[in-house]
Swiss-Prot record:
The lineage of its organism: Bacteria, Bacillati, Bacillota, Bacilli, Lactobacillales. InterPro entries: Chorismate_synth, Chorismate_synth_AroC_sf, Chorismate_synthase_CS. Its cofactor is FMNH2. Pathway: Metabolic intermediate biosynthesis; chorismate biosynthesis; chorismate from D-erythrose 4-phosphate and phosphoenolpyruvate: step 7/7. Its EC number is 4.2.3.5. It comes from Lactiplantibacillus plantarum (strain ATCC BAA-793 / NCIMB 8826 / WCFS1) (Lactobacillus plantarum). Transmembrane segments: none annotated. Belongs to the chorismate synthase family. GO terms for molecular function: chorismate synthase activity; FMN binding. It catalyses: 5-O-(1-carboxyvinyl)-3-phosphoshikimate = chorismate + phosphate. PROSITE patterns: CHORISMATE_SYNTHASE_1. GO terms for cellular component: cytosol. This is Chorismate synthase. NADP(+) binds at R40, R46. Gene3D superfamilies: Chorismate synthase AroC (3.60.150.10).
């Protein structure tokens, strides 16, 4: 079963990740990983840091000649902006009057600053914000891209896209395949499946930036061809939809998760929500609709998995809100760090990545994942077993 850990601060020397449980024999496409990292840096409404960073991953363990070994995979992503913060973010040199000049003592409402400082005893809130920054998600995207490549070898494909930015909702054809969605969102810089609203949303983001404010939005992820039976109804913590919800909520700024119709299902009758069952001699078992987003009883049911995430607006405001200085206890405006007007576009890449990670975790927990060929054979045999059930 796969697991991972990340380390590193936003303006530290680098981000580091260790991914365990990936089968041996997977031919990694490094360019594809870097393409995912570049997509995370894109999108209308990003801040100036994206002009500094040009993220590329370096594999330093667990891969030989481009092929995974089955051992832990170690990855790094350099922080180019560290050159401007080398003294302030030096991991080793003792603190001095010079390298502590940019202390943060005015916590930002909505950020981890104040509570993180209280919990860990930090008087310089930079010690909190450097790790709680969404910069860390670059490594989760790199790890998620590896998982996506493994899923593709099992003919499982997924995509994350933007469904809403601020008050602007996009009406999309929910029956589109992953390939069709990918083709549509590639046509604009907001990852929208319908480009009609792009000019209007550009104007909204520009006006919001001028006002010193920020915007959130809604992300939708669709995964196709996931076999039925991943996860389990037998205990609360083995339900895969619960694990997906936890992973999505673990992404910075996410405040809500829906599976399938989610909260909308609560306002309908059961006869309108439950997905009727069908069977075909060739295709096997299916559902006539997909209101439940590919899950029943905490298990995948073979239909496309649909996960939606609500992202709050970024808490760093260029027109800062009221706060209190933790050193003087005097009421002041919150501190300002370089930030984005909206990060909903990169967040869609991050949420897509963590969904890929959790699906890979479930697959490698269910089937022998020692090497890719065996995993493919086992999953293929399992699919046939389900078809004949």
């Amino acid at each position: 079963m796969i697991n991972y850990v990340t380390a590193g601060e936003s303006h530290g020397p680098q981000l580091t990740g260790v991914l365990t449980g990936i089968p041996a024999g997977l031919q990694l496409d490094i360019d594809a990983i870097n393409t995912g990292l570049a997509a995370r840096q894109g999108g209308f409404g990003r801040g100036n840091r994206q002009q500094i960073e040009h993220d590329t991953v370096q594999i330093i363990g667990g891969v030989r000649h481009g092929v995974t070994l089955g051992s832990p995979i170690a990855l790094t992503i350099m922080n180019r902006d560290h050159a401007h913060w080398a003294a302030i973010m030096d991991p080793v040199s003792p603190a001095t009057a010079t390298n502590t000049l940019r202390q943060v003592t005015r916590p930002r409402p909505g950020h981890a600053d104040l509570v993180g400082g209280m919990k860990y005893g930090h008087r310089d809130l930079r010690n909190v914000l450097e790790r709680s920054s969404a910069r860390e998600t670059a490594m989760r995207v790199a790890i998620g891209q590896i998982c996506k490549q493994l899923l593709a070898q099992l003919d499982i494909h997924l995509v994350g896209y933007v469904q809403q930015i601020g008050p602007k909702q996009v009406t999309a054809d929910l029956t589109l395949s992953v390939d069709q969605l990918q083709a549509q969102i590639a046509q604009n810089d907001l990852r929208l499946p319908d480009a009609a609203l792009v000019p209007e949303i550009h104007e909204l983001i520009t006006a919001t930036k001028k006002a010193g404010d920020t915007l959130g939005g809604v992300i939708r992820v669709v995964a196709e061809n996931v076999p039925a039976g991943l996860g389990s109804y037998t205990n609360w913590d083995t339900k895969l939809d619960g694990q997906l919800a936890a992973a999505v909520m673990g992404v910075n700024a996410m405040k809500g998760v829906e599976i399938g119709d989610g909260f909308a299902a609560a306002s309908h009758y059961g006869s309108q929500v439950m997905d009727e069952i069908s069977w075909d001699e060739h295709a096997g078992w299916s559902r006539l609709t997909n209101h439940l987003g590919g899950f029943e009883g905490g298990m995948t049911n073979g239909m496309p998995i649909v996960v939606k995430a609500a992202m709050k607006p970024i808490p760093t405001l260029y027109k800062p809100l009221q706060s209190v200085d933790i050193a003087t206890k005097v009421s002041q405006k919150a501190s300002v760090e370089r930030s984005d007007t909206t990060a909903i576009v990169p967040a869609s890449i991050v949420v897509e990545s963590v969904v890929a990670i959790e699906l890979t975790r479930a697959l490698t927990a269910t089937f022998d994942g020692s090497n890719l060929a065996r995993l493919q054979q086992t999953v293929t045999a399992y699919r046939e077993e389900l078809r004949q059930y």
